[in-house]
Amino acid sequence: MILKLAVIFFSLGIIPAFAQEPSNPTLEIDSISIPHADFNVVSRDSKIVPLNEIHVVSWQVTIHNELMYANPNGNAVVRFYDYNIEDKFLEIGMGSKPDNKFWIAVNLPDDPGYVVMTTYDERGWVPGGAPIILAYTDRAGLTVNNGQRIVLSNLDVETFALKSYSVWGKEGSQDPPAIHSGMFVMDIISGNPTENPLLFFPYVLAACIGGLVAILLVTKKRSS
């Protein structure tokens, strides 16, 4: 019930911002539906797919993971690649039930390389719950909400322009399929906030969702 209220709150807030999209030339938008079978590969065999637009300055990625996992060790991992620096990427990983592990990693070529910034071995995300949101600006860095709360705040990744993505889900090539059905949808919006103040709205909203869920949880505990 708590998560449903958060989703309703999110929907009511986001609709006015996007309603102005057709008349707003400063917005760049990508909506991507990824076939579930694309996750049944190891990372080295994943295909890098270019986005329709290069997202710069200020962007937000909303991830709706409605995949049905095929085994407890299966994962759904998405990497976002930088336009300016080869092999620089952000990684979001979502594990299967019952653990629902979750992690965020960054790969910076040369030094320091691949670094896991935060990880949750249990209850890291909620299948069927609120979406996962990545929000970035050149000045504020990267903030991630796992659908329950903010789990990474203002990480300095220098400039990061989204140009492409890849997905994978198997740890080893001999492992069984990670995913057997379902949907994985990403909505990406970007632009320059100095030209369009409405672009600040999704980032403020992402923080509000985490706060709302926390307040509702505390209220529920006190009333029970």
Predicted regions and their residues:
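Short, aromatic/His-centered strand-loop micro-motif at the edge of beta-sheets
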Residues: 108-132
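Hydrophobic secretory-pathway targeting helix
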Residues: 1-25
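Secretory/extracellular carbohydrate-interaction modules
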Residues: 21-109
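Localized edge beta-strand/strand-to-loop motifs within extracellular or lumenal beta-rich domains
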Residues: 126-147
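Flexible glycan-contacting loops in extracellular carbohydrate-active proteins
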Residues: 152-192
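Surface-exposed loop/edge segments in extracytoplasmic proteins
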Residues: 86-90, 113-116, 148-154
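Juxtamembrane/start-of-transmembrane alpha-helix segments at the extracytoplasmic/lumenal side
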Residues: 192-205
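C-terminal membrane-anchoring or membrane-association module
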Residues: 211-224
